[in-house]
Design a protein with these regions (language model features):
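Extreme N-terminal starter segment of soluble prokaryotic enzymes
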Residues: 2-7
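Active-site metal-binding loops of divalent metal-dependent hydrolases
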Residues: 13, 260-263, 373
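Short, structured active-site-proximal loop/turn typified by the sulfatase FGly-forming signature C/S-X-P-X-R
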Residues: 20-73, 132
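His/Asp/Glu-rich, glycine-adjacent segments
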Residues: 62-220, 327-331, 339-345, 378, ...
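Active-site neighborhoods of enzymes that stabilize oxyanions during catalysis
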Residues: 116-117, 286-421
Length: 441
């Protein structure tokens, strides 16, 4: 059993450079304290480097070929319809508001997340440990929770203690509403109130503490323009330290993993990935942020390689992936290479591993597109973050994350290493897919 209880803190979209600057100049005292007492490295996300995909990798210890969450927006072949998790409010509306909200909150965990993937909550609950989560969208566990809204009766199955934007609250904490005033950090403020309540009561063995407001600000202002949001995230982390009686007392009780789910880069212009396939019958294109997918329907006259070749002259697409049987190929600058599962791919961190896994996700498109520098693909409603920040591609800026561990004696190289690291700290054997992870330089 872990000598200390463990908290996984996820600051959505925090880049390594921003984290390093904040702890270097004292603007983030709580993060600085943890960094001074822990081990820090730059780690790598998964691909596409988008929040639902990345949080599923953090929770399961697997890439998308394991957990089956392919993107923020994708085409469900079995049901012949678009699944939209929240590229933008307008995109939710374009895909059907009620169905999209149900997909994002319930069906991602109940239907879309692979039953063969094992979440941290499931594994630790099975081993007799009390689990808790605040606001994270990949939450699948064994405990049934009913919504707080009387008119909504669909349950969620999550960790023992589960708090999700006031919609699911396993305990009455008195926390404020999470959904108003997000520019002022209302969601992180809600997390801080719940986290303080949990720590004060020593109410868990393992907690996921998810802070999304930094990503919201970084999309609006760019990755180097969200210092105020980072200060609020730091205050939310500081609330945990204070609730334990102070920083030293906090570390006496808890081990910590602190990371982000993905990076973020500046975007200068938007593009519609659909434009490259305007004259092609029998395809469905889904895209948002800095990654997109093309689904080939039976009536399409072009094979997947020919679809990928249509993007050779498109300056908005840097690298295009497709499968031929079990083999994965990548096209870049008009040239084609075979992707080795554990090998390098161009200059991308862990490029072969991440590209191979994305292409072997059964819910992924037949063609997967990683955007060119400075480009974002508009979503279903035409929304984008041009002039701000975005993520999703294979590029290092979108893919590298800060990784800080305190009290665990481990330095995860990838976000998929986090779950097995935590499980081993509790003396729980990770699932087989998480034991043989290898990484390319």
């Amino acid at each position: 059993m872990a000598s200390r209880k463990t908290i996984l803190i996820v600051i959505d979209g925090l880049t390594p450079s921003m984290f390093e600057a904040a702890i270097g100049d004292g603007r983030a005292p709580a993060l600085t304290f943890l960094a001074e007492n822990g081990s820090y490295t730059r780690a790598v996300s998964t691909f596409p480097s988008l929040t639902p995909v990345c949080l599923s990798s953090l929770a399961t210890g697997g890439h998308p070929d394991v957990h089956h969450i392919p993107h923020l927006v994708w085409y469900d072949r079995d049901r012949a319809r678009i699944v939209e998790y929240g590229s933008s409010f307008a995109a939710l509306r374009a895909a059907g508001m009620a169905r999209s909200i149900l997909n994002a909150i319930i069906n991602m965990n109940r239907l879309h997340l692979s039953p063969d993937a094992v979440t941290l909550y499931e594994a630790l609950d099975d081993a007799g440990h009390a689990t808790a989560a605040i606001n994270i969208t990949c939450y699948r566990g064994h405990t049934r929770h009913l919504p707080t809204l009387p008119a909504v009766t669909i349950p969620a199955y999550g960790p023992k203690r589960f708090f999700f934007y006031n919609l699911f609250e396993s305990d009455p904490t008195g926390a404020p509403l999470a959904v108003f005033g997000r520019r002022q950090g209302s969601i992180d403020g809600y997390a801080a109130a719940v986290g303080r309540w949990l720590v004060t009561r020593d109410g868990f063995d393992f907690l996921v503490y998810y802070l999304p407001d930094y990503d919201f600000a970084s999309h609006a202002h760019g990755p180097e323009g969200a210092y105020e949001a980072l200060a609020r995230s730091d205050a939310a982390v500081g609330a945990l330290l204070d609730a334990a009686g102070g920083p030293d007392e906090f570390l006496d009780r808890y081990a910590v993993v602190l990371c982000s789910d993905h990076g973020q880069t500046n975007v200068e212009r938007s593009a519609r990935l659909q434009s490259a396939f305007a004259d092609v019958r029998g395809v469905i294109v889904t895209a948002s942020n800095r990654a997109g997918m093309v689904y080939r329907l039976p009536e399409c006259a072009l094979d997947t390689r020919e679809l990928a070749q249509l993007l050779d002259a498109d300056g908005n697409a840097e690298t295009v992936l497709f499968r031929d049987g079990d083999d994965v190929f990548a096209r870049r600058d008009g040239e084609e290479v075979r992707v080795e599962r554990d090998g390098p791919l161009f200059d991308y961190p862990h490029g072969g591993t991440r590209a191979w896994a994305a292409a072997h996700n059964p819910n992924a498109g037949d063609v997967i597109v990683s955007a060119a520098p400075g480009v974002e693909f508009a979503d279903l409603a035409g929304r984008h973050h041009a002039g701000g920040g975005s993520h999703g591609s294979l590029q290092a800026g979108d893919s590298e994350v800060p990784m800080l561990t305190v009290g665990l004696g481990a330095e995860p190289e990838s976000i998929v290493d986090v779950a097995p690291t935590i499980l081993r700290a509790f003396g729980v054997e990770p699932p087989p897919y998480a034991r043989t992870l290898t990484h390319a330089a």
